[in-house]
Amino acid sequence: VLEDFKSKVGQHIEILELEQFGKSLFIDGEIQVAASDEHLYSSTFVGAGLKLNKKNERAAIIGGGDGGVARECISKKFNFIDWYELDPEVVEVCNKHLGDIGKKATEKNSVKCVWGDAFESIKSVSEDTYDHIFVDLNDDQFCIDLAAKNMESLVRILKPKGVITAQVGSQDKKPHQVENWLNVFHHHFGNTKLSRVYIP
C-alpha cells in the first residue's frame, strides 16, 4: 500500500502495488487504472473518438484523474484541452506514483484544468465549443445517472458533428451497465458506436 487516504471531496483514494498489474489507482474500493495496461485503455479511448471525427481543435475531458486521456489528447495534437476533474488530489497522487501515465499533462500550455463539479462548470461554457468530449467517469450506476441527467448540457457545448466518447465499463462483468449507457446515448443521438478493447 503506497497511499491510503480520504480526499477533501470525500473520495477514498488508494495506490496499491499489485503483483500482476503494477501500481494501480483505486477510488472507493474500485480499481480505476493499472500501470500495466493503462496505455491500451487511454489510446483506444481517444482513438475511438478520432476515428469518427478527425478534428482536433478543442477537447473537453470529464473526469480522467489519472491523466491518461489528457496525455493522449496532447499526443494527438489537440490545440486546446479543458480538463474538468472533481478531485485535484486524485491528479496529485497519480502524478506522484503513476507519473508515466499523465506525463505532467497539467503543466502543458494546451491544458486548462477546471477543478470541481464538471457538470456545474460546463454550464458557463459557450454552445458549440468542443470537437470532442471524453467522459471518463467511474463505471457505476451513479455516474451513468449523472451523465444522463446532464447529457443535454454536453450536447449543447458539442460542435455540430462533434463526438462524445464515454467509458462504459465491462460488457462481460457488467452487461446491464453497458446497456444503460447505450440507452442514454441512443436517447440523445441518432447514432451510437460501441468500441471494445480487452483489458486484463
Segments (PLM) and residue ranges:
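The AdoMet/dcAdoMet-binding core of the Class I SAM-like
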Residues: 10, 21, 33-182, 186-188
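A short alpha-helical cap/connector motif
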Residues: 2-7, 123, 168, 193-194
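Short strand-turn-strand beta-turns centered on an Asx-Gly dipeptide
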Residues: 27-29
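N-terminal auxiliary segments of SAM/dcSAM-dependent transferases
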Residues: 1-23
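Conserved S-adenosyl-L-methionine
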Residues: 189-200
